Amino acid sequence: PILRMGTKDFIKKCNDAEIDGVILPDLPLDESVEFCNNLKNKNISPILLVAPNTSEKRIKKISKLAGDLIYAVSILGITGNDLSSKNNLKNYLAKVKDNSETPFMVGFGISTNDDVNWFNSFSDGAVVGSAVIKKVLKDTKKGVVENFVKNLKK
């Protein structure tokens, strides 16, 4: 959609909507330099992704190109997956931290207070998406999502 719209129009629409960051999950790194720099010139942070199989060299490149944040994908797979092997992620998260000066948050499969606390101890924060969507779909009463998020922070 971004390329079809045109990068200049996309950046203008983001700027008009006062968007301050965009996640770019499928933009090839080697083709993204100009686009990411144009975003940053308009104070829009390009949020780039790293994964457990991302090399140290590539993490360094991503760190230099990213805006205010890197999104560290916790698993190879789709969002909402189980994190039963999360203890094996310590080396990966240390690799991201050691090879990037850019703050990073971890996402994919994070759904409990224990998950959030665990990932917060190895990163700059945790992203909870699918679990919030599931709460909204399960219960539309006012305050359900707010209470869920408050409990994640405890």
Residue ranges with predicted function:
Residues P1-L24, N147-K150:
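Active-site beta->alpha loop and helix N-cap motifs at the rims of alpha/beta catalytic domains
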Residues P1-R4, P28-L29, V50-T54, M105-N113:
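Glycine-rich beta-to-alpha transition loops that act as phosphate-gripper elements at the mouths
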Residues G6-K12, S84-Y92, V144-E146:
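Charged helix-capping and loop-helix junction motifs
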Residues F10, T54-L65, V106, I110-A126:
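Catalytic cores of alpha/beta
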Residues G21-E31, A72-N81, G109, F122-K141:
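Glycine-rich phosphate-binding active-site loops on the catalytic face of alpha/beta enzymes
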Residues L39-L49, K97-G107:
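Short beta-strand/loop segments at the ligand-binding rim of alpha/beta enzyme cores
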Residues L49, I59-D98, K135-K141:
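Glycine/Thr-rich beta-alpha phosphate-binding loop at enzyme active sites
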Residues Y92-T102, S111-K154:
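Alpha/beta catalytic cores of nucleotide-metabolism and tRNA/nucleoside-modifying enzymes
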